[in-house]
Amino acid sequence: MGRRPARCYRYCKNKPYPKSRFCRGVPDAKIRIFDLGRKKAKVDEFPLCGHMVSDEYEQLSSEALEAARICANKYMVKSCGKDGFHIRVRLHPFHVIRINKMLSCAGADRLQTGMRGAFGKPQGTVARVHIGQVIMSIRTKLQNKEHVIEALRRAKFKFPGRQKIHISKKWGFTKFNADEFEDKVAKKRLIPDGCGVKYVPNRGPLDKWRALHS
């Protein structure tokens, strides 16, 4: 018996049902890698960020997430080079879906119980996504804006429902606006830290502030 189509599990009908000591024997998710491209690029190298945002409350299978990841990565490598971007899949498939297997061979009615004891066995995992939640993000250089939009557009076809493509006003994967980012770094209010930044608040010990601005 093959894999049941994902359209059967598209809608969020049940409560979240994660893998646990009560829910065992769950097959591994198809998606194992969530970050691609130049992951260790400094925060100031990739200022532009594009998001794919869900427009529906639904479930996305781990197979669909993997297919979208491969599709976006292939296009970005071809158009920007393998070191010209950083893709991050922002959903993780934690919800376990079940299947109540039915036999279809001759004499099946003697072997199975139909809908008696219909709580199924784990079949796979899906990610539950809300309206306005980000599915996938890409950060890159400013000149690659059109390539980001096209990569996300191609990846959209791997998912059910509707998604929107949004070019962020933030700097890269940070939560700070792009127009204020460089000023705050110059004033040492933000300290670059890998692909993110550390925020230095106004409060705190004066000695630390003096050491930072010396």
Swiss-Prot record:
Lineage top rank: taxon: Eukaryota
GO biological process: cell differentiation; male meiosis I; ribosomal large subunit assembly; spermatogenesis; translation
PROSITE patterns the UniProt entry points to: RIBOSOMAL_L10E (PS01257)
Pfam families, per database record: Ribosomal_L16 (PF00252)
GO cellular component: cytosolic large ribosomal subunit; endoplasmic reticulum; nucleus; ribosome
Keywords for the protein's UniProt record, in alphabetical order: Cytoplasm, Differentiation, Meiosis, Ribonucleoprotein, Ribosomal protein, Spermatogenesis
GO MF entries: structural constituent of ribosome
Record-stated family: Belongs to the universal ribosomal protein uL16 family.
Function: Testis-specific component of the ribosome, which is required for the transition from prophase to metaphase in male meiosis I. Compensates for the inactivated X-linked RPL10 paralog during spermatogenesis. The ribosome is a large ribonucleoprotein complex responsible for the synthesis of proteins in the cell. The small ribosomal subunit (SSU) binds messenger RNAs (mRNAs) and translates the encoded message by selecting cognate aminoacyl-transfer RNA (tRNA) molecules.
Subunit structure: Component of the 60S large ribosomal subunit (LSU).
Name by which UniProt lists this protein: Large ribosomal subunit protein uL16-like
Organism encoding this protein: Bos taurus (Bovine)
Taxonomic classification: Eukaryota, Metazoa, Chordata, Craniata, Vertebrata
Gene (UniProt): RPL10L
